[in-house]
Regions:
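Conserved acetyl-CoA-binding loop-helix of GNAT-fold acetyltransferases
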Residues: 93, 99-112
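Terminal substrate-recognition subdomain of acyl/acetyltransferases
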Residues: 1-5, 9-13, 124-167
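Short coil/turn motifs at secondary-structure junctions
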Residues: 70-72, 96, 128
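Conserved GNAT acetyl-CoA-binding A-motif
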Residues: 112-126
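Conserved beta-strand in the GNAT
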Residues: 54, 60-78, 85-92
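Short amphipathic alpha-helix that is part of the acyltransferase structural core
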Residues: 1-43, 47, 51-54, 61, ...
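Short beta-strand micro-motifs in enzyme catalytic cores
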Residues: 51-53, 84-86, 154-158
């Protein structure tokens, strides 16, 4: 049986209500926040030009990432970037689709989007995700190598599409 997979990339202002609801449901199933909290967070934090990469398998949303276009102050050792960057905000693959290559497919799609925008991208991640991001072209930043200004975090940093050797 062949599995039909589709990657759909849309800006927030292109998402249908059904697509938004599917995103809320997927996020609520992954994190311990109710759908109502997901909706409120989405409305408060997501802007119309943010990018949503959805992995659809047999008409079901099984993977999702958000790339948020933000002007961000990111301090990398000596360099402070005060430019628009893509914050890689969310990465979810449903449990039953993990370790089957679908996550890699989704991240590679994201990497292409990031390269095509010619912007740098930054993410915060848990320890258990570092090797996954590294094998997909992201560079690990130790906590003393970066400072995300005006943001509370307690995670590892990863950076993509940053060619200068300032880190």
């Amino acid at each position: 049986m062949k599995i039909e997979t589709i990657n759909i990339l849309k800006r927030t202002d292109q998402l249908s209500e059904t697509e938004k609801n599917n995103i809320y449901l997927l996020k609520a199933s992954h994190w311990s926040y109710e759908i109502k909290s997901q909706i409120e967070w989405f409305k408060k934090n997501i802007i119309s030009s943010d990018l949503h990469n959805m992995l659809i398998i047999d008409n079901n949303l099984v993977g999702y990432t958000a790339l948020r276009k933000k002007k961000c102050r990111l301090k990398l050792k000596k360099l402070i970037s005060n430019e628009k960057i893509l914050i890689f905000d969310t990465y979810i693959i449903k449990d039953e689709f993990r370790k089957k290559g679908f996550g890699t497919k989704l991240i590679k799609s994201n990497n292409k989007v990031i390269r095509d925008t010619n912007l740098m991208s930054f993410l915060l991640c848990d320890e258990n995700m570092i090797n996954f991001y590294k094998k997909n072209g992201w560079k690990f930043l130790k906590s003393d190598q970066f400072q995300l200004i005006n943001h509370k975090y307690n995670s590892n940093g990863m950076i993509f599409n940053f060619e200068k050797d300032n880190t």
